[in-house]
């Protein structure tokens, strides 16, 4: 009887687990288009957190920074170092772009683990981290692509396209394909990591007591921060590469 009872409990747990759905969306109709409402909601929350915390931190700037001002100046210095290392001496104009990418992705990733999105009920789907949706990560990757094309064209003009036949015209298809694979690799790496992290936590919570997934959640927080850094570093590296013209 104990074996039978145990088997039934296991099957019930697996049945509950099979009810976990991925990919349901809450749509808003804007004009003739359908947009993912839950992505916009969570993105607005993340933007509000960033703007609110930055405003509070620098509302009374001090010559000798303390508290929140000190923290944000440290973050700015860190982003400047990353940008300078990857882009070179002309990094200055790109610090806001790289910093925005890093902070948005970082806070988005952490919001998936720290904010109780599920208490907000939607007619369809559920709220989750913005980077848990492929549309967000693809949009961020496409922005990066536009940025490095803009950087290259601004620096070299139409001569920028000469890189596609370097070191030999035979490599033209490969060099073109490389520029298309950059946004794909950026978007799918970030999306896959965040989605996999949330699914692992859901699976463990469904099968084992709630205290067991806690170490996995802490690991997820760490790797989420690393993913934000990787995305920002690669974006800066691509921009620097387009300006210098080397691979």
UniProtKB/Swiss-Prot annotation:
Its subcellular locations are: Plastid, Chloroplast thylakoid membrane
Q: How does it sit in the membrane?
A: Multi-pass membrane protein
- Main subcellular localisation: plastid
Q: Which InterPro entries match?
A: ATP_syn_F0_a_bact/chloroplast, ATP_synth_F0_asu, F0_ATP_A_sf
What are the entry keywords? ATP synthesis, CF(0), Chloroplast, Hydrogen ion transport, Ion transport, Membrane, Plastid, Thylakoid, Transmembrane, Transmembrane helix, Transport
Q: Does the keyword Coiled coil apply?
A: no
Membrane spanning stretches: 38-58, 95-115, 134-154, 199-219, 220-240
One cellular component term (GO) for this entry is:
chloroplast thylakoid membrane
Q: Which Pfam families match?
A: ATP-synt_A (PF00119)
Protein purpose: Key component of the proton channel; it plays a direct role in the translocation of protons across the membrane.
Quaternary structure annotation from Swiss-Prot or TrEMBL? F-type ATPases have 2 components, CF(1) - the catalytic core - and CF(0) - the membrane proton channel. CF(1) has five subunits: alpha(3), beta(3), gamma(1), delta(1), epsilon(1). CF(0) has four main subunits: a, b, b' and c.
Family assignment?
Belongs to the ATPase A chain family.
Q: Please report the name of this protein according to its UniProt entry.
A: ATP synthase subunit a, chloroplastic
Recorded source organism is: Guizotia abyssinica
Q: What is the lineage of its organism?
A: Eukaryota, Viridiplantae, Streptophyta, Embryophyta, Tracheophyta
């Amino acid at each position: 009887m104990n074996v039978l009872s145990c088997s039934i409990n296991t099957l019930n747990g697996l049945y509950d687990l099979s009810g976990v759905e991925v990919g349901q969306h809450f749509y808003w109709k804007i004009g003739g288009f359908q947009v993912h409402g839950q992505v916009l909601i969570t993105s607005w929350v993340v933007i509000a957190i960033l703007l609110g915390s930055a405003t509070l931190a620098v509302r009374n700037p001090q010559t000798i920074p303390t508290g929140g001002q000190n923290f944000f100046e440290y973050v700015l210095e860190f982003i400047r170092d990353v940008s300078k290392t990857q882009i070179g001496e002309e990094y200055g104009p790109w610090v806001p772009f790289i910093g925005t990418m890093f902070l948005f992705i970082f806070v988005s990733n952490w919001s998936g683990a720290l904010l109780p999105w599920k208490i907000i009920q939607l007619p369809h789907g559920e709220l989750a981290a913005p980077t848990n949706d492929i549309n967000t990560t693809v949009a961020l990757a496409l922005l990066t692509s536009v940025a490095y094309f803009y950087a290259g064209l601004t620096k070299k003009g139409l001569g920028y396209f000469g890189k596609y036949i370097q070191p030999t015209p035979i490599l033209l298809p490969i060099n073109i394909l490389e520029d298309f694979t950059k946004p794909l690799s950026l978007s799918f790496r970030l999306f896959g990591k965040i989605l996999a992290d949330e699914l692992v936590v859901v699976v463990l919570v469904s099968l084992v007591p709630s205290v067991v997934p806690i170490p996995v959640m802490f690991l997820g927080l760490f790797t989420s921060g690393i993913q934000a850094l990787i995305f920002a570093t690669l974006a800066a590296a691509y921009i620097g590469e387009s300006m210098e013209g080397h691979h």
